[in-house]
From Swiss-Prot:
Residues 86-160 form the PRC barrel domain. Keywords: Chaperone, Cytoplasm, Ribosome biogenesis, rRNA processing. Binds ribosomal protein uS19. Pfam families: PRC (PF05239), RimM (PF01782). An accessory protein needed during the final step in the assembly of 30S ribosomal subunit, possibly for assembly of the head region. Essential for efficient processing of 16S rRNA. May be needed both before and after RbfA during the maturation of 16S rRNA. It has affinity for free ribosomal 30S subunits but not for 70S ribosomes. This is Ribosome maturation factor RimM. Belongs to the RimM family. Its main location: cytoplasm. It comes from Thermus thermophilus (strain ATCC BAA-163 / DSM 7039 / HB27). PANTHER family: RIBOSOME MATURATION FACTOR RIMM.
Length: 162
């Protein structure tokens, strides 16, 4: 079993145990989630309130119980995730991929930062010098960044990987 983080619980919603969910919309397709420190919980209800998702979990029946879960990480089992359409990827699948600029490996994806308007790849460089091994931030934006078989290809960005 392999778990991947899909989000965190935000503030409670109303009085009957609802929690705002901050994270991947993939939660809409799940029947259960793994809650940090609390184990597996069935999703009993899930709905939108404006732009937010609200989740009701089995055993979380009032606001006091919901408050105990605020800020906790929420995970899903990889096998429970729905398949994605061609050209789309789960972010966890990008972690560890090599990054190439003009056919030369310049680093490896170590994390992905949710920066609001667009997500950002955190790439740890490869090389002999300390500067070569520094982390660099690259917006995850097509057509400048392409996920292809064998790695991620980034168009040259002057000064970033020189």
């Amino acid at each position: 079993m392999r778990l991947v983080e899909i989000g965190r619980f935000g503030a409670p919603y109303a009085l009957k145990g609802g929690l705002r969910f901050r994270g991947e919309p993939v939660v809409l397709h799940l029947e259960r989630v793994y809650v940090e420190g609390h184990g597996w919980r069935a999703i009993e209800d899930l709905y939108r309130v404006g732009e937010e998702l609200v989740v009701h979990l089995a055993g979380v029946t009032d606001r006091t119980l919901a408050e105990a879960l605020v800020g906790l990480r929420v995970y899903a089992e990889v096998a429970d995730l729905p398949p994605l359409e061609e050209g789309r990827y789960y972010y966890f699948a990008l972690i560890g991929l090599p990054v190439y600029v003009e056919g030369r490996q310049v680093g490896e994806v170590v994390d992905i930062l949710d920066a609001g308007a667009q997500d950002v790849l955190i790439i740890r460089g490869v090389g002999e010098r300390l500067r070569d091994r520094a982390e660099r931030l690259v917006p995850l934006q097509a057509p400048y960044v392409r996920v292809e078989e064998g790695g991620i290809h980034v168009d040259p960005i002057p000064g970033l990987f020189d």
